[in-house]
Amino acid sequence: MENVRWGRRIRAFRRLKRLSQVELAKEMEMSVSILGQIEQGKRVPSERQLDKIASLLDIPIEELKGEIKAGE
């Protein structure tokens, strides 16, 4: 269930930034397929990947992890 939560949050923040899967995958230097698997909860992102996703989406890693609410 944790994997699905990660994926949903990543997808939601990606969409808020108006990035396609293709664009984010390219910036992440990973395939669209792997990013899709992460967003679907079928693959667990590594800490390095989470840090890079948070950086690219310009959000604190704690917000991506769901540890703080937006705007705090």
What are these regions (language model features)?
Residues R15, K26, S55:
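Alpha-helical residues within the helix-turn-helix
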Residues M1-L16:
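A short, Lys/Arg-rich alpha-helix, primarily the initiator
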Residues R15, E29, Q40-K42, K69:
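Residue-level detection of the helix-turn-helix DNA-binding "recognition helix"
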Residues R18-Q37:
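Short alpha-helical DNA-recognition segment
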Residues I34, V44, E63:
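Residues in the helix-turn-helix
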Residues R48, S55, I61-E72:
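Short, charged recognition helix plus adjacent turn
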Residues R9, S20, S46-Q49, P60:
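Residues that mark the N-terminal boundary/hinge immediately upstream of a DNA-recognition element
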